């Protein structure tokens, strides 16, 4: 009797969580209220329905990515407000004369940086530079910021340390005595990055929005200003701080300082030296982004804690029968991860799917490395929503984007890159190697 009640309670929490997931999807797509409001309604609702404890529903406020966002908003604002972003942007545009050339250059630089730096950290340090380029060239920010964050995600698949999901998969493999080489992800990741760049400088270019009319008029990045009265030393300090922040992120493991801590050291140096005033530093923190991300983390947590994510994945896999073909299984795992990652975040999706994928590989006798590679690459396809990965959320307000802008540009990218990935995966990582 108690067992039946327990199962009913679990089913009830999963049903409620599914309801909140569907509500979020509909409201995000409809966008009649700001996305951050929808996200926070979900967080509050999950608390009121006892799906999550309040401390878990709002744990996002102390999440390392949120703390990184806040510090990088300040560093980015100082870099922009001192005029240094515009100067650097002017140098870059000497080599990239057209929007398509600029997009190609941005995606190459971002992708390669993401392979050695975290994809979120790479996007965070390059966003103010691209805003400066936008101001120098009058190219719309919305045309170049989406390719930036998408390239950051693709570049994360160039190495073991490029994205958190890669390390999660590595940890899972190590429990069964297997592992990936440092650059082994690049067998799939590098071709995908190349395909993504070609996509956006050709047919994908027309899918990028021109959202100048939608940009936040109160944002410092939307206001024309003169930098003549700003002391030159402030610009140089902002550049030096940005460079040292990047270096600290690159050598995070060696120096033992977390990304967000390095970013906050840089932000505090800028405030203490009065390169940026404390009031301007506070104003630069985009609360739309913070609240959207915090709310989406609550939903991701609920999907994981209630087993709803497991339920979705296992239900789909079970439909394949007892002896699924390797190709069908690979495609299904890839699609599940690609769908979940756009609503749970890429890190949460990988964390959810890694143990499931290992169990599947052991059940059918497949190479766990192959199954996990499909899992990680599918989980990196977080291009179709502003909540799929932290960088997507960071540029949402700055670029004046709507939810459907991500769908319009990101969904075709997922399809194109997904097709190439599914061709390459069985070549480099066959489920049943000879």
Identify the meaning behind each predicted range.
Residues 54, 100, 141, 182, ...:
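Alpha-helix N-cap/start motif
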Residues 2-70, 74, 187-314, 330, ...:
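Hydrophobic transmembrane alpha-helices of multi-pass small-molecule transporters
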Residues 24-33, 109-118, 149-161, 248-254, ...:
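Transmembrane alpha-helix interface/packing and boundary motifs in multi-pass membrane proteins
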Residues 39, 70, 107, 148-149, ...:
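Residue-level recognition of transmembrane alpha-helices
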Residues 37-42, 119-126, 146-147, 158-162, ...:
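Hydrophobic alpha-helical membrane segments of integral membrane proteins
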Residues 176-179, 358-369, 434:
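Helix-coil boundary and interhelical linker segments in multi-pass alpha-helical membrane proteins
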Residues 44, 48-140, 284-289, 293-364:
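Membrane-embedded alpha-helical segments and adjacent helix-loop junctions characteristic
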